[in-house]
Amino acid sequence: MLGLHVGTLISLFLCILLEPVEGSLMQPCQPINQTVSLEKEGCPTCLVIQTPICSGHCVTKEPVFKSPFSTVYQHVCTYRDVRYETIRLPDCPPWVDPHVTYPVALSCDCSLCNMDTSDCTIESLQPDFCITQRVLTDGDMW
């Protein structure tokens, strides 16, 4: 009985001790400026811009004992409030609409991943990945 009590106290002490370390190493879920690429099928260039996206740590719990009858929901850092902006891609042929709309994060939240607004994959392409030739927003080529 005493061993169980001491083990509980040690666990509690470690949680209190490590809490500031964990908090300082992991950024909270919040909007951050990120370089992203905008491209469209049929247009020869990829426009690289800076825009706020949601990024950061969300507390999640993985159950020790997994049951086939229970569902585990993992929370991710995703958009709470979002505004959409439209930009014109350069050098698109006349038959391709050169406009691309992208989300701008106004605020973020730890919640279930919404496939309509977020990339919920484990390993995805970087946000500034381009298939076509890259162009910076100030006109410089990469």
UniProtKB/Swiss-Prot annotation:
> Which organism does this sequence originate in?
Oncorhynchus keta (Chum salmon)
* PROSITE patterns linked to this entry: GLYCO_HORMONE_BETA_1, GLYCO_HORMONE_BETA_2
S-S bonds: 29-77, 43-92, 46-130, 54-108, 58-110, 113-120
Annotated InterPro entries: Cystine-knot_cytokine, Glyco_hormone_CN, Gonadotropin_bsu, Gonadotropin_bsu_CS
A Pfam family annotated for this chain is: Cys_knot
Q: Which residues form the signal peptide?
A: 1-23
Q: Name one GO molecular function term.
A: hormone activity
- Could you provide one GO biological process annotation from this protein's UniProt record? G protein-coupled receptor signaling pathway
Task: Relate the protein's function as given in its record.
Answer: Involved in gametogenesis and steroidogenesis.
Positions annotated with a glycan in the UniProt record: 33
Domain of life according to the entry: Eukaryota
- Keyword terms, alphabetized: Disulfide bond, Glycoprotein, Hormone, Secreted, Signal
In Swiss-Prot or TrEMBL terms, this protein is called Gonadotropin subunit beta-2
Where does this one sit in the cell? Secreted
Offer a single GO CC term for the protein: extracellular space
Q: Which gene encodes it?
A: cgbb
Is Disulfide bond among this UniProt entry's keywords? Answer: yes
Q: Which residues cross the membrane?
A: none
